[in-house]
């Protein structure tokens, strides 16, 4: 911010905040995570996942929080069509290993695991039926409970379909199916990093 950088706030901010060409018509709810216990964005995403009845599509670079993974598993077990899109090769090997600890349970529950190659997934998007959330919230302990984060939520079938059409479907088409860890070393590493998941 201007204040954080020690400078005065400019008199004319129009160059930074130009008027949109279209004001839009989709209402957006804004929720935050503020360190110290205000976790409205985290709670909104929890409720979104818990409320899914038909579909749940999740794209996120870091999915290590046991509570969120439990909710994703619960959605699949109650018959929701669930797809999880992550990086095939992440910039955080520990977070990838921690998530892979859940691959057997996720696969058994019917979750489609998709790993996007040749890039690091950076989107933080959840589509649950016709509710969409997007923003800065990774599904890990730092983002959900400790960092300053923000999420925007839209209850809109049209928005949900646009996100599916422009983000999920093309990326899933380029992705490879995720497979559970194989071999004693990989299984041990995934167990270890999952055990330390609250620090990731």
Segments and roles (model prediction):
Residues 1-200:
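Charged, low-complexity intrinsically disordered terminal segments
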């Amino acid at each position: 911010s201007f204040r954080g950088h020690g400078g005065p706030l400019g008199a004319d901010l129009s160059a930074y905040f130009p008027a949109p060409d279209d004001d839009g018509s989709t209402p957006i709810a804004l929720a935050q995570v503020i360190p110290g216990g205000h976790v409205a964005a985290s709670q909104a995403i929890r409720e979104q996942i818990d409320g899914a009845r038909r579909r749940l599509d999740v794209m996120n670079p870091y999915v290590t929080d046991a509570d969120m993974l439990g909710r994703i598993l619960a959605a699949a077990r109650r018959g929701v069509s669930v797809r999880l899109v992550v990086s095939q090769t992440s910039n955080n090997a520990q977070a990838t290993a921690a998530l892979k600890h859940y691959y057997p349970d996720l696969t058994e529950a019917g979750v489609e695991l998709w790993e996007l190659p040749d890039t690091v997934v950076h989107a933080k998007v959840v589509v649950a039926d016709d509710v969409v959330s997007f923003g800065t919230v990774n599904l890990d302990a730092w983002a959900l409970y400790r960092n300053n984060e923000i999420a925007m939520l839209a209850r809109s079938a049209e928005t949900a379909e646009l996100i599916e059409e422009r983000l999920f479907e093309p990326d899933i088409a380029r992705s490879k199916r995720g497979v559970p860890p194989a071999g004693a070393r990989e299984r041990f590493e995934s167990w270890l990093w999952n055990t330390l998941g609250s620090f990731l």
